[in-house]
Amino acid sequence: MYKFKTIYISYDGMTDPLGQSQVIPYLLGLSKHNIEIHLISFEKAEKYSNKKHHIENLFIDSNIIWHPLKYHQKPPVISTLLDIWHLRKKVNEILIKNNISLVHCRSYISALVGGSLKKDKGIPFIFDMRGFWADERVDGNIWNLKNPLFKIIYNFFKAKEKQFIIQSDKIVSLTNNAKNEILNWQLNGINNSKIQVIPCCADLNHFSLYAINAVQLKSLQKMLAIAEDDFVVSYVGSLGTWYMIDEMMEMFKVLSVKIPKSKFLIVTADEPDIAYNAAKKLNIPKALIVVKKAERSEVPYLIALSKFSIFFIKPSYSKKASSPTKLAEILGMGVPVICNSNVGDVQSIVEEGNVGVVINEFNKAQYEIAIERMIALLPADNISIANYAKKYASLEDGINKYLKIYTDIFNTKSDDRTPL
């Protein structure tokens, strides 16, 4: 029997919520298939201090060896260069002690090292894009291209993006929309088979309507002062940058006029005043807005309280490659959605499954039409919606797709296998 050894590089921390939802579950699944994974991640000091032991416990009895590195935030640019230096050093330490068959690079900073290993040592690497990262930085107003430094950095990473795509052994895209965009670039050697689409999946054992305890649900409802006859709609996630709280609040106002017993349940770790101020601007009574910061274990229950959930994401070029995890989580709970078009594959997913309503513009007329269409879908067929989520975004399906990529690459390196 043989064990394949890989390095998985994430510039996101495992003590961050994203690492815990979008990295660790996949790696735990892959590690059960006789794969030893050396996981390198960059951890923010406070979160690492609070969550270190929790993450270490997750890896007990697995084939995952965690190599946490310190994330440096300041000064800009220089801090990132310092992180890359530490990353290269750690990778070299691992290579000295292990016969590595593959490097899996999550996003662009990681791929800088993966690309070098492919070029210098011939080690295969997966470019797991996660999105058009450089364009996201511009569209999200993080990089102002009027600043010459950011213009240089942007151009550098756009050139690297094409290099990673050509150089990698496999590309993982979150959406078919982004895959088609890449194919339209007509890069040398890039065809349909080189790009695997794996959307952001959800743990549908956790986000499951079957896992809801009715007594706990009633208790939570009472604690939030939500009445039995309240018409609850929810939003789950951040309130800044990409997520359009003002427009979501405008739609809720339209709903509250039509259904006076409406309440807007906002599940977020952000400051509640962001939501309350958005409501105040529209003269929506504060009593209609419920803002709740929740542990991951509570989120399925909060979604389950709602008739439907909404999310509006700022449309932009980079959002062709976006796969909102919240969509899979909400549908996993059997709850329909109202959302907007021009974000990854969201429109096709929602419309093909008849699991909600998609709007094309942000205005009162569109909101009224969307609400009428949603009300026509209610009461929702919760079981059908949950089953549809399993079809397109189950964690098990995502793990199997990654496993197929790994085994295809491993099979080309049969001479590099290390005996157990």
Stretches found by the model and what they are:
Residues 1-56, 60-64, 96-98, 170-172, ...:
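N-terminal subdomain of nucleotide-sugar transferases
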Residues 6-7, 227-243, 248-252:
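Conserved donor-binding/catalytic core segment of Leloir-type glycosyltransferases
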Residues 17, 243, 293-302, 309-331, ...:
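Nucleotide-sugar-dependent
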Residues 51-58, 208-226, 382:
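A short helix/loop element that forms part of the nucleotide-sugar donor recognition site in Leloir-type
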Residues 89-93, 112, 116-120, 133-135, ...:
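Membrane-proximal helix-turn-helix segments that form the acceptor-binding/catalytic region
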Residues 177, 201:
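Carbohydrate-associated surface elements
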Residues 267-268, 273-301:
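Nucleotide-activated donor-binding/catalytic signature segment of Leloir-type glycosyltransferases, i.e.
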Residues 361-366, 376-411:
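A charged, aromatic-enriched C-terminal amphipathic alpha-helix characteristic of glycosyltransferases
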